[in-house]
């Protein structure tokens, strides 16, 4: 028995969930929705110049989410269902099979991603994966069920390690995982931002690697998938 973390973009999903989200938004967003996004994009550009590419991505993600402000939970669910319908052809079917193998061995599966949680929930349902724990970026809602347009903590890089460790502590306290599972952690992911997670894992597995990431895997004697 083990804990198995699986990244989403570029790993379980071969594409980029933000790109397809942007495609849907171009059809669904009104001019009013785009106003805060455009303002936020300017701030993201400044952040990118000062702090680099990853900082730009995070700020743009936050800006984009502001276009969701005022939408109901039902409207958001419909939006993410359209995302899944557009992106489902990019699912990594071989990795789906590997996940099911892990489950047959009694392993605990965590889908760990910076992607939005409602999208991942819809995706997992579409590909018929069951008993999956999801740690990802959340959208916040007002008590009346209307989206605030604000994100929770963006789960990326070192943040993934912190979130997994918090989840493990909570799950152990609640009796959801055994001490035996804590002795074996797997990590399936694809990018350089996942290197901290790979170092946490007993079994790092680099999925769909770029040439540069493949070399990193070889240098560290990590498995390839």
Walk through the language-model features, giving the residues of each.
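C-terminal cap/substrate-recognition subdomain and adjoining C-terminal extension
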Residues: 1, 78-79, 85-225
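Amphipathic alpha-helical interaction elements
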Residues: 26, 65-69, 125, 205
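Catalytic cores of large soluble enzymes that bind and process phosphate-bearing ligands
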Residues: 13, 68, 156
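Metal-dependent phosphoesterase signature
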Residues: 58-94
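Short, surface-exposed helix-loop/turn micro-motifs enriched in polar/charged residues
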Residues: 13, 56, 111-112
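Active-site neighborhood of HAD-like aspartate-dependent phosphohydrolases
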Residues: 1-52
């Amino acid at each position: 028995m083990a804990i198995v973390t699986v990244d989403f973009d570029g790993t379980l999903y071969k594409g980029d969930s933000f790109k397809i989200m942007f495609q849907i938004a171009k059809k669904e967003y009104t001019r009013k929705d785009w106003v805060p996004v455009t303002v936020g994009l300017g701030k993201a550009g400044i952040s990118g110049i000062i702090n680099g590419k990853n900082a730009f991505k995070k700020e743009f993600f936050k800006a984009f989410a502001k276009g969701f402000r005022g939408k109901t939970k039902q409207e958001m669910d419909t939006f993410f269902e359209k995302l899944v319908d557009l992106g489902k052809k990019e699912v990594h079917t071989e990795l789906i099979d590997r996940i099911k193998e892990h489950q047959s061995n009694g392993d605990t599966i965590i889908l760990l991603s910076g992607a939005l949680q409602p999208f991942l929930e819809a995706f997992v349902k579409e590909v018929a994966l069951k008993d999956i724990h999801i740690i990802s970026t959340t959208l916040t809602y007002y008590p009346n069920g209307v989206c605030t347009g604000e994100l929770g903590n963006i789960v990326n890089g070192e943040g993934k390690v912190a979130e997994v460790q918090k989840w493990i502590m909570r799950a152990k306290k609640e009796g959801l995982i055994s001490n035996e599972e804590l002795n074996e952690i797997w990590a399936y992911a694809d990018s350089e931002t996942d290197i901290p997670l790979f170092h946490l894992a007993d079994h790092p597995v680099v999925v769909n690697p770029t040439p540069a990431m493949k070399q990193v895997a070889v240098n560290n004697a990590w498995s390839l998938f």
